[in-house]
Design a protein with these regions (language model features):
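Mobile active-site "lid"/loop adjacent to the S-adenosyl-L-methionine
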Residues: 83-113
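C-terminal beta-strand of the catalytic ATP-binding
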Residues: 83, 171-174
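Class I S-adenosylmethionine-dependent transferase superfamily signal
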Residues: 18, 96, 117-121
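Conserved Class I SAM-dependent methyltransferase catalytic core
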Residues: 108-171
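Glycine-rich, phosphate-binding/catalytic loops in enzymes
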Residues: 46, 93-96, 149-150
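Conserved SAM/SAH cofactor-binding pocket of Class I
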Residues: 1-89
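Structural motif
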Residues: 68-69, 96, 123, 147
Length: 174
């Protein structure tokens, strides 16, 4: 069974989506926000009837959770971390401005979560295992460089339906 970790899981969309696509997967969804965690727990219980034993909700922090992971045990890590800069936070569209700042802001340069992911999560993956990250539309080059500088391999960017850079895929070297 593939082992999947969803970091900054929010309500669990990514982890539960992987589980729906790959029913044999064992997914762990990690979320720091107490408010979002309540929704995550509810979704784990109800979104995929019969899947709950293989989907675990954990209240935890991306910046420390890596310390509890054994080496080489995961097949896939997915994350849609906060990625807005402090400047971008001041110019949000009204519908986005209603979201909790904790779910959006990632420090002055918008990269604090990507730095932690690049530095601390590679070895939790089995050789060849993948990391899939949502990124902001101007972050492609910087995030790819962060990953490459921390020993990730086969790094590529995928675009969304609007043609914007949206997703980075990287692998632990084989």
């Amino acid at each position: 069974s593939p082992r999947v970790l969803d970091l900054c899981a929010g309500t669990g969309c990514l982890g539960l989506g992987v589980k729906r696509f790959c029913p044999d997967a064992q997914a762990t969804c990690v979320e720091k926000s107490p408010e979002a965690f309540r929704y995550l727990e509810q979704n784990v219980r109800t979104a995929l009837p019969g899947a709950a034993p293989a989907v675990q909700a954990v209240q935890g922090d991306l910046f420390t959770y890596w310390q509890s992971l054994p080496e080489g045990q995961l097949d896939l890590i997915v994350s849609n971390p906060p990625y807005l800069t402090a400047e971008e936070m001041q110019h949000l569209q009204p519908e986005v401005a209603q979201e909790p700042a904790m779910a959006l802001e990632a420090g002055d340069d918008g990269l604090v979560f990507y730095r932690a992911l690049a530095q601390h999560y590679r070895d939790a993956l089995r050789p060849g295992g993948a990391l899939v990250l949502e990124i902001g539309w101007q972050q492609r080059q910087t995030v790819m460089e962060l990953l490459a500088g921390n020993g990730w391999a086969d790094i590529e960017c995928r675009r969304d339906y609007g043609g914007n850079d949206r997703c980075i895929i990287a692998h632990r070297p084989k």
